[in-house]
Amino acid sequence: MIDAIEQNLNRGVQLLKNISEEEYRNTTIAPYYSSIGGHVRHILDVFDCVFEGLNSGNINLINRKRNLRVEQFTEEGIQYFEEIIEKLQQLNSEDFNKIVKVTDDLGLGVLTVDYTLGGILIQAHSHAIHHFASLGYIISQLGISLPDNDFGFNPTTPKQH
């Protein structure tokens, strides 16, 4: 599991190493006018919430850091990716079945439910892939090449021939 998540997050690192600060901050692409940096920050904030709540067993997805420097500067984004990857590498697979409480606001109020650590990591990974797909659209509109052919594709998505 960790290898798959790390491989996916490294796609983000490769993207950031190959774009300009202007491209990273660009918010001109309709319909959402979001930046690559905004998506990167959001993706990594979800993982960060997992690690912030790991010791207590209470993971709160509402309490994201929202570090604006991560949204504005590629080097800050790369550093955040590297911090999350380092924390992932420190996890033990024996802990994936550990029960944790996960709190989030689904739009009709705050809810707390039991997950396994593995379950919330899978959700964070799928969430990252989803946002990479959104980034794929922004990247395309900005005329930037994707880091690789799997960027933003869920492994279960059928490949077109």
Regions found by a protein language model. Give the residues of each.
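Hydrophobic packing residues in well-ordered alpha-helices of helical domains and bundles
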Residues: 5, 9, 36, 40, ...
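Hydrophobic residues within well-ordered, non-membrane alpha-helices that form the packing/core
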Residues: 16, 85-88, 139
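Short, contiguous alpha-helical
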Residues: 25-63, 110-150, 158
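Short amphipathic alpha-helical segments and their helix-coil junctions
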Residues: 16-22, 107-112
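Short, contiguous, pocket-lining structural segments
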Residues: 1-8, 31
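Amphipathic, well-ordered alpha-helical segments in soluble domains
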Residues: 8-18, 46, 80, 131-134
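Short, helix-capping/interhelical loops that line the mouth of catalytic, cofactor-
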Residues: 46-90, 94-110, 144-161
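A cross-kingdom marker of C-terminal helix-rich interaction/assembly modules
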Residues: 1-2, 16, 51, 135
